[in-house]
Amino acid sequence: YLDGKSELAIRGCLCARYPRESFQLADKLSAGFFKTREEVLPFFEEQLRCTGAGYFDYYLIHAMSAERYDFYREVGAFDIIPQLKREGRVRHFGMSFHDKAEVLDRILTEHPELEFVQLQFNYLDYEDPVVESRKCYEVCVKHGKKVSVMEPVKGGALAELPADAGAILDALGGGSHASYALRFAESFDNVFMVLSGMSTLEQMRDNLATMSDFR
């Protein structure tokens, strides 16, 4: 992101200031930044250099779909990342996923080395026929994979509900609208991480309060 400056920012704000074992860091292998197998490892090494992290706790094949599956196999992603894990430069190997549940089932069947899947998962998309949040989650459970959640608040849409829907949650007196969305995602057994985009300090504090006293 930001022409690579996001990784430099992480280096200055996080990796250069705090002990490495005090935080967890993820990065991703993104199609569009390389075309051949020979370019994958240099791309990864540049990410490590820019962040100064030494290793990534979570390294993901980014935005996996049926369309991109063949490409990632052709460039050796499923060979190179496990080798990086054996070398200790990656701790956990997974992918973010954007496609149908049947595609996910095929990929996890063919690549059991994947440890986790990042899914778009929220109560609005749970039964959505395009996103298939529930079905994709159930595929992960079937294969014994942990799930990290993206879009738990659906780009902020579930943080500011329409008046009628918001009134129902407000009457419960259980916190912000966003907190209900986070708690929905976190309540599933195979979910081990919930990622929420935050643009203000207030949003960050609300999310931290929700997850620190989860109920």
What is each of the regions a protein language model found here?
Residues 1-2, 28-32, 61-66, 96-100, ...:
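Active-site beta-loop-alpha junctions enriched in small/polar residues
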Residues 6-16, 37-48, 52, 69-79, ...:
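Distinct, well-ordered alpha-helical segments
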Residues 10, 25, 47, 56, ...:
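Conserved, mostly hydrophobic/aromatic
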Residues 16-38, 62:
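Structural motif corresponding to the early beta-alpha repeats
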